[in-house]
Amino acid sequence: MPKYRSATTTHGRNMAGARALWRATGMTDADFGKPIIAVVNSFTQFVPGHVHLRDLGKLVAEQIEAAGGVAKEFNTIAVDDGIAMGHGGMLYSLPSRELIADSVEYMVNAHCADAMVCISNCDKITPGMLMASLRLNIPVIFVSGGPMEAGKTKLSEQIIKLDLVDAMIQGADPKVSDSQSDQVERSACPTCGSCSGMFTANSMNCLTEALGLSQPGNGSLLATHADRKQLFLNAGKRIVELTKRYYEQNDESALPRNIASKAAFENAMTLDIAMGGSTNTVLHLLAAAQEAEIDFTMSDIDKLSRKVPQLCKVAPSTQKYHMEDVHRAGGVIGILGELDRAGLLNRDVKNVLGLTLPQTLEQYDVMLTQDDAVKNMFRAGPAGIRTTQAFSQDCRWDSLDDDRANGCIRSLEHAYSKDGGLAVLYGNFAENGCIVKTAGVDDSILKFTGPAKVYESQDDAVEAILGGKVVAGDVVVIRYEGPKGGPGMQEMLYPTSFLKSMGLGKACALITDGRFSGGTSGLSIGHVSPEAASGGSIGLIEDGDLIAIDIPNRGIQLQVSDAELAARREAQEARGDKAWTPKNRERQVSFALRAYASLATSADKGAVRDKSKLGG
C-alpha cells in the first residue's frame, strides 16, 4: 500500500518544524492526515488565455477541501506566443516548456504533494504541465481555461469570423487600408481564452481529453461560458477520489501513466491528425511520451498519418469554423465518436472519470447520448461581448450541429480528405523526418518543386519576403532556427503570414528546422531533423538548389548528388568550431538560452533535453 507522500512532512516528531510552517499556512491538526493536493495554476495578466484564471484555482481548492483534501496553490510562468512572435521574445517560448515542467516538479517534490490539478491553457503551459505530470506520476486532472470566442466584424457587407492570424495578415498586406486593418485588429481577439482556432493551445487541450487526463468538453467549451465552471468544480471533487483510490486502495489505475498509456497516445495522435491540429502537438506528444517512458516515436506518427482521414477542418485551415463550432458539433468526443465508428481507435483505455472509451462515447457523444444535459452543454455558444471574465455568459446555440455530411465534424464517409491533417515527410535532408500540416495545404501544391532561397534567420527571411525578393515558385529555407540552433526553435508565423499578404500563399513553400505556429497554413514544412546546428543536411542547402516536395508519397528531396553533398559537408566540417553555425547572423543569446541549447535535442525527439549528457 503506497504511503501518502505528504506524510513525510506532516508526521513524526522530527517534522515539528515542517508542521509549524504548515500551520502558518492555515493547516490544523485535523489536516495532517489528509492528502495535500497541489493546485497548479498559471494565471498571468500577460496572456489572454490566462488572464481569467486568478480565481479559478480557488474554485478548485474549495472543492478539494470539501471532499476531504488540503489544497495548496502555486503558479507557473506562461508565455504568450502571439505577443512574443516576430522578435527575440520567441526564442524563449519553447524553452519555457522545460521550465514549467521543472518548476512543477520542484514545487510538488519539495513539498511532497500527493496529487495535482493542473489549470493550464496556452501553447507551452499545457505541454509543460503534461510533461511534469507524467514525470511525477501522481494522480492528476487537467482543466484548462478554455477557448476564446471567435472575433466577428463586417467586411464587404458580410459578417465574417476572425482570429489573431487575420489581424497579422491584414496588418502586413499593403493592399489593405489602415482603417480596415484597424477594424480587424480591434475585432480579432474579443474575449479571454486561448486563441479561437485549432491552434497549438486548443489542439493540446483537446489532446488531454484523448489522453484521458481531462474531462469531456475541456478542449472546446468556451472560456466565457458559465457551463465551463462545472469542469473546475468536478476536477476538485474528482482529484480527491483519484488520490484516495491510489494511496488508500493501492489502485494504480488512478495514475497518469496508466491512463495516458501508449494506446491513449495513439488515440491522441489519431485525433490530432483527424482534426488537423497544430504541428506543435507532434513536438509535445513526443516529449510527453518520453516523460512517461513510452516508446512513441515519429515512426508511430507516420504510420497513423497514412491511415487516418481528416474529419474536422477549423481555422486556420478554413475561416468557416472555429472552436465554438467544434463544440457545437460535439467537441473532442464528437470527433472520437466518428473515429471509433471508423475502427481507428484503441477502445481499451480509461479517463480520469474512470470511464472506458465506449462508456465515454455512450454518455458524451452527441450522436449517441440520450442525456439532455450533455446535449445542452454542447449547445453552449458565444455571446459576442468583449470580456476578460470567465463564465460571464450563458448563450446557447438553437441546435446542435449533428450534420456529419456537411457540418464541422464529418463521418468517415464524408471526410474532408482521406489523408489526415498532418503528415511526416522523409528525404535526404530530413533523414529523421519533418512535419507538414496538410489540412492547411491547397490541393494544387501537394506536389511542389522549386529553387531554394536560403536564410539563416527568420528576420532575414521576413525582410526578403516583404522586400519582394521571394517570388512565385520559390522554396524558402530558414535554417539554424531549431531547438539548438536558434536557440529555442522559433515559430515562423510571420514568414508564412507575410507570404500570404504578398499573394504567395499558394505559390511558394517554406521549409525550416524551426517550427510553426498553430495558426500557420500553406505549404509550410517544419521540424526538419536533424537540425542544421546538429549537423543536419538542411545546413548544406545552397541558393538555387532544387527541392522537390511530394506530400502524397511522403517525400522531400534536395536534388543534389550525394557526391556534391559529401563535398559540402567536408567544407562545412573544415570550419572547425564555426562548423554548423550561421555564417552571417548576429544574434545576442542569453546565458539562460545557451544553457537550454547545450542540452537540446532535435525536433524528432520532441526537442527535450539530451539525457545522455546528464548521465540518464
From Swiss-Prot:
Stored PANTHER family: D-XYLONATE DEHYDRATASE, D-XYLONATE DEHYDRATASE YAGF-RELATED
Protein known as = Dihydroxy-acid dehydratase
What EC numbers are recorded for this enzyme? 4.2.1.9
Q: Which domain of life is it from?
A: Bacteria
Q: Which GO terms describe its cellular component?
A: cytosol
Q: Where is the active site?
A: 517
Q: Which GO terms describe its biological process?
A: isoleucine biosynthetic process; L-valine biosynthetic process
- Which reaction is the catalytic activity of this chain? (2R)-2,3-dihydroxy-3-methylbutanoate = 3-methyl-2-oxobutanoate + H2O; (2R,3R)-2,3-dihydroxy-3-methylpentanoate = (S)-3-methyl-2-oxopentanoate + H2O
Keywords from UniProt, A to Z, are:
2Fe-2S, Amino-acid biosynthesis, Branched-chain amino acid biosynthesis, Iron, Iron-sulfur, Lyase, Magnesium, Metal-binding
Cofactor binding note from Swiss-Prot or TrEMBL: Binds 1 [2Fe-2S] cluster per subunit. This cluster acts as a Lewis acid cofactor.
Which residues are involved in binding Mg(2+)?
81, 123-124, 491
Which gene carries the instructions for this protein? ilvD
PTM N6-carboxylysine: list the residues.
124
Query: What quaternary arrangement does the UniProt entry report?
Result: Homodimer.
Quote the InterPro entries the UniProt record gives.
Dihydro-acid_dehy_C, DihydroxyA_deHydtase, DiOHA_6PGluconate_deHydtase_CS, ILV_EDD_C, ILV_EDD_N, IlvD/EDD_N
Q: A GO molecular function for this record?
A: 2 iron, 2 sulfur cluster binding
Does the keyword field hold Glycosyltransferase?
no
- Pathway the protein acts in: Amino-acid biosynthesis; L-isoleucine biosynthesis; L-isoleucine from 2-oxobutanoate: step 3/4; Amino-acid biosynthesis; L-valine biosynthesis; L-valine from pyruvate: step 3/4
User: Which residues does the annotation say bind [2Fe-2S] cluster?
Assistant: 122, 195
Q: Which family does it belong to?
A: Belongs to the IlvD/Edd family.
Task: Give a yes or no for keyword Iron in this entry.
Answer: yes
List, alphabetically, the HAMAP family matched. Answer: IlvD (MF_00012)
